[in-house]
C-alpha cells in the first residue's frame, strides 16, 4: 500500500486481500508454533506443574504482547491511512513515533513484570514449585520486554509498507530459531522454563532486528533516516497511535484477565492439574486465534487504505470476505475438537500423567465449543480499528472482559470446575449477539449513504 501500488477495484480486491492475508496467516501460525512447541516440550519434560506455571505467567506475558500489538497496530493503521490520503511524510512520522513508544513503554513493562511477578503468582494460588518455575521464566522475559514487544510490532509495520512477504519471513526466522533452541535448552540441557524463556527472547530479538533494518533500508517504500527532523518524540502522533491501538491492548488484557480469573478459580475449586488442563485449552485456542488474527491483519491494510480513499464498497467487500474465512475455519476446528479432542490434547501430555489426560479432554469440550465466535469478535474489533473507530473497537474488547465476571461468579460456586470452563463460551454467545446487531446497523447505514 504505497506510491507504487496499482489501483485496486472490486474485480481484483480478493486477490489483493489474499496477497496480504496469506503471508500474514502463515506468519501468525508459524510464530504461534513456537508457543505450541514450548507447551509440548514443557508438558513432556516438566509435566503438569510446568504447564500450570506457564499459564500463571500468562497475565504478564499478555500485558507485554498487548502493548507491542497496540503500538504496531496503531502506527500501522495510521501509516496506511496517511498513505491512502497521499500524505507520505506524515506516514513516516507515525513509524518513527511507533519506535519511540516501543522503547519507552518497553522499559515500563519490564519494570512492572520484574517488580510484580511474584505477587501476581501468589494471588493466583501458585504452590512453591509452580511459583519457582514461573518466576524464573518471567524474570528473563521481563528484562527483555522491549525486544519482545518490537518483534510483535515490527511485522505489522513492515506489512503496512507493502512488504507482507518480508513480514512473514521475519516471523518465520524468529519462530524457527525459537523452536530449535527450545529443544536444545529444555530437552538436551534440562533448563526447564528458563530455557524456554531464553529461546523465546533470542528468536524474537532476531525477528525485531530484521524489521528494524528494513525500515531504514532503501527497500522500504518509506525509508527512514536518523537525519529526519521528525526523529524526535512528538506527543500528538503518539497519542493517536495509542488511541487507535488501545483495543488491541485490551484484547490481550482481556486474555490476561481471563487467565488470571480462571487460574485463581481453578486453584480454588480444583488443583494444579485443572490449571494445566486449562493451559492446554489455551494452546489449542492459540491456533485459531492466530489464524483469525492473521485473516484480520490481512484485512487491515486494505480496509484502512480504502477507508482513507473513501471507497466504502470495497471496505465492505474486504470485511465480509475475511469474515467468511474466519467463521468457516472456526466451525471446522470446533467440530474436530468436539469429535476428536484427544488428537489435540495428548501431544502435550506424557504417558505418565493419565489424570491430566482426562481433565484436558473435558476442558477442551466444555471451554471451546463456540470458539468460532471468538474469531468473529477478533475480526469485528480489527475492522473498527482499521477504520480508526477506536471507540467501538475498545467497547467490544471491554465488554468481552466485563461480561465474563458475572458468569464466573455465578457458575463457579454452582458447578465448580465445570462452571469455570463454561463461563467463557456462554459469555461469548451473549456478546457476539450484540456485536452482530452493531455491525448490521453500521453496514446498513453505509449502504444508505452510498445510495
Model-identified regions with their sequence ranges:
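Short runs within selected transmembrane alpha-helices of multi-pass transporters and secretion channels
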Residues: 72, 141-160, 167-175, 196-211, ...
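Helix-loop interface residues and adjacent transmembrane-helix termini in multi-pass membrane transporters
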Residues: 33-36, 45-48, 82-85, 160-161, ...
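Juxtamembrane/transmembrane-helix interface segments of polytopic membrane transporters
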Residues: 31, 35, 39, 43, ...
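Small-residue-rich hydrophobic transmembrane alpha-helices
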Residues: 51-111, 148-162, 166-167, 277-341, ...
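Transmembrane helix-bundle signature of multi-pass secondary active exporters and lipid flippases
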Residues: 24-73, 77, 141-148, 239-305, ...
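Short alpha-helical transmembrane segments in multi-pass integral membrane proteins
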Residues: 1-21, 79-146, 188-245, 303-370, ...
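Membrane-water interface regions at transmembrane-helix termini and the short interhelical loops
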Residues: 154-162, 182-191
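Transmembrane alpha-helix boundary and packing residues in multipass membrane permease domains
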Residues: 24, 28, 40, 77, ...
Amino acid at each position: 500500500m504505497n506510491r507504487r501500488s496499482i489501483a485496486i477495484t472490486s474485480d481484483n480486491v480478493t486477490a489483493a486481500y489474499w496477497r496480504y492475508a496469506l503471508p500474514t496467516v502463515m506468519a501468525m501460525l508459524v510464530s504461534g508454533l513456537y508457543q505450541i512447541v514450548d507447551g509440548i516440550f514443557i508438558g513432556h519434560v516438566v509435566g503438569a506443574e510446568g504447564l500450570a506455571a506457564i499459564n500463571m505467567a500468562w497475565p504478564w506475558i499478555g500485558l507485554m504482547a498487548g502493548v507491542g500489538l497496540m503500538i504496531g497496530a496503531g502506527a500501522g493503521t495510521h501509516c496506511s491511512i496517511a498513505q491512502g490520503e497521499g500524505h507520505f511524510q506524515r506516514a513516516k512520522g507515525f513509524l518513527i513515533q511507533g519506535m519511540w513508544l516501543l522503547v519507552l513503554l518497553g522499559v515500563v513493562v519490564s519494570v512492572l513484570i520484574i517488580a510484580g511477578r511474584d505477587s501476581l503468582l501468589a494471588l493466583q494460588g501458585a504452590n512453591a514449585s509452580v511459583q519457582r518455575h514461573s518466576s524464573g521464566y518471567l524474570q528473563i522475559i521481563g528484562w527483555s520486554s522491549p525486544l519482545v514487544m518490537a518483534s510483535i510490532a515490527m511485522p505489522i509495520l513492515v506489512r503496512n509498507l507493502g512488504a507482507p512477504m518480508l513480514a512473514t519471513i521475519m516471523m518465520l526466522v524468529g519462530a524457527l530459531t525459537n523452536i530449535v533452541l527450545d529443544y536444545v535448552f529444555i530437552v538436551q540441557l534440562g533448563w526447564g522454563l528458563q530455557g524456554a524463556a531464553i529461546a523465546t527472547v533470542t528468536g524474537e530479538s532476531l525477528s525485531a532486528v530484521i524489521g528494524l533494518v528494513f525500515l531504514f533500508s532503501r527497500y522500504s517504500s518509506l525509508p527512514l533516516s536518523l537525519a529526519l527532523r521528525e526523529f524526535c518524540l512528538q506527543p500528538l502522533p503518539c497519542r493517536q497511535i495509542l488511541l487507535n491501538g488501545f483495543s488491541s491492548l485490551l484484547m490481550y488484557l482481556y486474555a490476561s484477565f481471563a487467565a488470571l480469573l480462571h487460574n485463581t478459580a481453578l486453584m480454588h475449586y480444583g488443583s494444579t492439574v485443572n490449571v494445566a488442563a486449562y493451559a492446554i485449552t489455551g494452546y489449542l485456542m492459540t491456533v485459531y486465534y492466530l489464524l483469525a488474527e492473521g485473516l484480520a491483519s490481512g484485512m487491515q491494510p486494505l480496509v484502512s487504505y480504502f477507508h482513507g480513499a473513501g471507497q466504502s464498497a470495497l471496505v465492505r467487500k474486504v470485511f465480509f470476505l475475511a469474515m467468511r474465512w474466519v467463521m468457516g475455519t472456526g466451525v471446522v476446528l470446533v467440530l474436530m475438537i468436539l469429535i476428536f479432542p484427544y488428537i489435540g490434547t495428548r501431544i502435550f501430555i506424557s504417558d505418565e500423567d493419565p489424570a491430566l489426560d482426562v481433565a484436558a479432554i473435558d476442558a477442551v469440550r466444555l471451554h471451546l465449543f463456540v470458539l468460532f465466535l471468538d474469531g468473529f469478535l477478533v475480526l469485528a474489533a480489527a475492522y473498527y480499528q482499521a477504520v480508526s473507530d477506536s471507540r467501538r473497537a475498545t467497547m467490544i474488547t471491554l465488554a468481552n472482559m466485563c461480561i465474563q465476571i458475572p458468569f464466573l461468579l455465578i457458575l463457579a460456586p454452582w458447578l465448580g470446575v465445570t462452571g469455570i470452563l463454561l463461563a467463557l463460551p456462554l459469555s461469548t454467545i451473549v456478546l457476539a449477539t450484540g456485536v452482530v446487531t452493531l455491525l448490521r446497523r453500521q453496514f446498513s447505514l453505509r449502504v444508505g449513504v452510498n445510495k
